[in-house]
Amino acid sequence: MPQFLSEDFLLDSEFARRLYHEYAVDQPIFDYHCHLPPEQIAENYRFKNLYDIWLKGDHYKWRAMRTNGVPERLCTGDASDWEKFEAWAATVPHTIGNPLYHWTHLELRRPFGVTGTLLSPSTAKDIWDRCNAMLERDDFTARGIMQQMNVKMVGTTDDPIDDLRHHKTVAQDSSFSIKVLPSWRPDKAFNIELATFNDYMAKLGEVSDTDIRRFSDLQAALTKRLDHFAAHGCKVSDHALDVVMFAEADDATLDSILARRLSGETLSEHEVAQFKTGVLVWLGAEYARRGWVQQYHIGALRNNNLRQFKLLGPDVGFDSINDRPLAQELSRLLSKQNEENLLPKTILYCLNPRDNEVLGTMIGNFQGEGMPGKMQFGSGWWFNDQKDGMQRQMTQLAQLGLLSRFVGMLTDSRSFLSYTRHEYFRRILCQMIGRWVEDGEAPADLPLLGEMVKNISFDNAKNYFAIEL
């Protein structure tokens, strides 16, 4: 019987073990999309305790705790840090079968070195004390953990109005070699249907010194901010397309839509689609001219629990998977961006695994001459960021495209302890390829398949994003 979380965890064949230990394990981490707070990296934040680094802001854990009957006070409320950690420790034994159980113990093992002990009510105090003692050391600050985990690059998620001063601080510090670069997340600039849109336009106008009245004014304001981001090393954009919309409109129509919204009018769904299409097509061309990568995260159904949304706000664990069709609108959007050969490198992620084959085939429609893997089907996202979800995403990518050109894993996390997700991904990748070899579906060519694993683990992303390390 295999031991839980051994050095050969998930590696169920000799070939898989060789792939992982000889080609994957020592590869650095290129974490091209995350939600780490850049100010904590800039100030080399020292975490107060295990709750501060591990549970604070983690909606994955909060969902599990709520499902286990834990009161909200112990999730997001005013309970002490220890009480919240104790409640999490009591929940962990009930998460067997959920990726949280694997993640929890991988994160305790690296970087804390906790092995042979499972988190539970009986071990909570010992683990709390041991890890808190380590968090007082210099190698367990925000930067220290990144260095321990062999991180080479992180891409944070940043709003166009951000001043990016924390990125500048990191970039100017010659003692810290890890690249910390902003990613452009302009959702607030095109979600015209939201009640917050007009206030955001005022803020965008202020930071860009632009009076936004017409669509061309919005373009001018965003261009200034794109230049600002580019000056700070940005090479990546990210868009939450909860619902993919497409409806064309001329400039006069876009001017009218924007003016009426700024005057307080409510727009029709068709007008919202026209405006979003206009912004996305224009931004796509800007990304292409600048050599940026655009990412589309598709299919989240957000803020489902209205009562909790009013109490706690967004992004606290009340989101789920949408089932709106996306193929036709996405095809038209990408085709429109491609009309003048201004479709940038693009990564498509779907939250509904039903859409895996849709994206897996969609990327084949728009690949670029002389650019391997220009269009990417992104790694299993959010609810698919687990063993089965990763296996399905990679299997379908292999069947419908070229797995060997895949840019691999990203944490998409707010936690400095989530880097073990790269380890988890690499183990699953090696397990999958090892099984192909065992079944005679792939040659037992270690150099060939080892190079493929090495590329997916790090080199493909480094080359795709064209960021000098």
UniProtKB/Swiss-Prot annotation:
GO terms for MF: glucuronate isomerase activity
Enzyme Commission identifier(s): 5.3.1.12
Keyword Protease set for record: no
Keyword Transcription among UniProt keywords: no
Alphabetical list of InterPro entries matching this protein: Metal_Hydrolase, Uronate_isomerase
Pathway(s) served: Carbohydrate metabolism; pentose and glucuronate interconversion
Keywords for the protein's UniProt record, in alphabetical order: Isomerase
SUPFAM superfamilies assigned: Metallo-dependent hydrolases
Domain of life according to the entry: Bacteria
Catalytic activity reported: D-glucuronate = D-fructuronate; aldehydo-D-galacturonate = keto-D-tagaturonate
A biological process term (GO) from this entry: D-glucuronate catabolic process
Family: Belongs to the metallo-dependent hydrolases superfamily. Uronate isomerase family.
Name of the molecule in the record: Uronate isomerase
